[in-house]
Amino acid sequence: METTQKQIVLGILAHVDSGKTTLSEAMLYRSGMIPELGTVEKGNTMCDNDPLEKQVGHSVRLAVAHIDTAMPDLTPVRIHVLDTPGYSDYLGQDLSALDAVKSVAAVVDATQGVEMLTRRMMQAAKDRNLCRMIVVNKFEDPNADLVGLLKEMQEIWGPGVLPINLPTKNRTRVIDCFDRDEGDADIMSVEEVHRAFIEKIV
């Protein structure tokens, strides 16, 4: 019996230099779609392959990539990743991407906090009733105030903002707070965050 492939379209959005393209590249690499992890600095990422993008070091157009994977029940899934530019000059491309997706991931630079374009795009995603998630980038930076950042995000987007993952004490790895209820985290209590998720689900 032929199995129908599930299609997911995910928009990656954020203010410029927050790490959208780096996240997209990491997703492609970890899923086995590309053999080597490129970097924006080297100009060899899948999504920033335009000569101008390589020259200026950031996205200037909407890029599309895809990831082939499977659900836990082995149903095949193709995830279409839309990497948005992140500059106000290209806001039209960012907004048009929202019309093609069901979910968005907003990348927040832990050293900079929630920036203007990220707020604007998340509001636009909310207005379209899209599923929204937040990816905190550069959390390993010792100068990143993670407690302050979480408070800022909750003030902007509400108390429902909870970390699914918490950084370990040395900030080199993360602890999955959804499946686990114990661990030595750098901020907050894994047990308390896990309990908060369970209460929301129940």
Label each region the model flagged.
Residues 1-108, 157:
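P-loop NTPase switch module centered on the Walker A-proximal segment
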